[in-house]
Amino acid sequence: TVIAPTWFSVSDTNGSLRSFAEASYVEKAHEKGLQVWGVVDDFNYLDDQGNRTDVAAVLASTTTRTALIDNIMNAAAACGMDGVNVDFEKVMDEAAGEDFVEFLRELSIRCRQAGLVFSVDDSVPYHFNTRYNLAEQGVIADYVIIMAYDEHWAGSEEAGSVSSVDYVRYAIEKTGEYVPGDKIVVALPFYTRLWITEGTSLTSEAYPMTGVDALLQKYNMTYDWDDATGQNYAEATDGTTLYQMWIEDLQSFNVKLTVMQNYELGGVAAWRLGFEPAGAWDLIRVYLER
């Protein structure tokens, strides 16, 4: 069992890292039998002006790439963590994609030398994100963690599920075209979205699984099981306002795990810790024991 704290962000174009890593955290995790894979991202750091780092520029240069990798490895050694997890979601074009893959190659070699598990987080593969090169990742990484959520997200033009059962199935099968099954870890959501339609305006807010019951009561929503998505679907109207929710709960979570049983996979992950009801871990345990 692994916990992956969001500890590291690229903080300037020299390859510096902002770090929240703590050796004491790793020690406590180890006492509980957990491995710690520190997450390195390209989007959580904003400078004083509210700007993100131009990570593409960092990856484009051998010098700054090496500096970034050195900083990651030094931070890993200092806190004693067990693995490095790369979560880069701002790789915007083919050229940046090639530099990103080269960064993964170089970092993977250093991780292997240091005895660290190396994993990469990815969105579900479609024609518009091929620059992430899953086939190459399947060679380089120990694990490719496919984020089988945000099927509908904050910027979506229509309301819908965060993670329907067909979306999970597609994520597994499409990723499996590029990555060996035993390297694929499927990440499921511990959260759901409440969608609010007022006239032509559509907005949504993400809520933890544990917050669903309060929302159902607050908006007086009724729900029914929807076979198509493998979820309970809830809605209510208040005057001209429509409230909708494709509920992520233990029932929908179990449907996804049951589908995953049909494939030889590397494991299951979830975003994020603290959003889940206690029973989620029992379902995961059953899945792993099968």
Where are these regions (language model features)?
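Catalytic domains of carbohydrate-active enzymes, especially glycoside hydrolases
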Residues: 1-13, 71-84, 255-268
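Hydrophobic faces of well-ordered beta-strands that scaffold small-molecule active sites
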Residues: 2-5, 36-40, 84-86, 118-120, ...
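Acidic/aromatic/glycine-rich contiguous surface patches that form carbohydrate-binding/processing clefts
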Residues: 256-290
